[in-house]
Amino acid sequence: AKHVDALLDGLRFDAKERPRLVHRLDKDTSGVLLLARSAKSAAMLGEAFRSKEARKVYWAIVAGVPRPAMGRIDLSLEKRPGRGGEKMAADEEGKRAITDYKIVANAARRASWLVLEPVTGRTHQLRVHCQAIGTPILGDGKYGGKDAFIEGDSPISRNLHLHARGIQIPNPGGGMLEVIAPLPEHMVKTWRYFEFDERDEAEPFLEWRE
């Protein structure tokens, strides 16, 4: 698939300026991606993220059940060379990375549906943080290895089960604008397999965060 940057000219429509990416998603992550139609709006949205006024929330299926059921992962990350390319790794001398999470549902001890809200925006942050607490995201062989896959006769896709579910940004007209993205097909099938119900998480943003 073409990188998103290569598609931006096609999203210009009648605007004089080329759209700008406000943030990025990992190559295999689905969901909401925010574009700015002008340099001015890009600057405003960038500041909204820096000030934590704008928020992003992700859904993931992880292998196992994290403990506690709700918490904050505060683990600094650093980029390191590795087999198959560079990887992010926990490193006290790295850049601070913080993720809030909570369990929505779990399938015994096999897997859990998590809501993840990154407080910082480091590369591969959610993937490394989930692996660091012993529950790698399903399909994330890069960080979870074989533990990121449910073996046997399971029909679960081997694709990454990480989805940018929603984004919340200031509305220039007042209040907040919230955009929700539907799950991709492979994750819909996994939800059905585990008998999870999307309606169980009616409020996608974590309101318990300090």
Language-model features, listed with the residues they occupy:
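Pseudouridine synthase
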Residues: 1-8, 39, 79, 105-168
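Broad gene-expression machinery/nucleic-acid interaction feature
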Residues: 31, 57, 72, 98, ...
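RNA pseudouridine synthases
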Residues: 1-87, 92-95, 105-108, 151, ...
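Internal, well-ordered alpha-helical scaffold/interface segments
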Residues: 43, 75, 99-102, 124, ...
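Short, acidic, Ser/Thr-enriched surface-loop or helix-capping motifs
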Residues: 91, 118, 171-172
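Residue-level signal for inorganic ion chemistry
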Residues: 34, 60, 101, 126, ...
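Short acidic/polar mixed-charge low-complexity motifs
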Residues: 95-97, 122, 134, 173-177
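Conserved hydrophobic positions within beta-strands
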Residues: 62, 100-103, 137
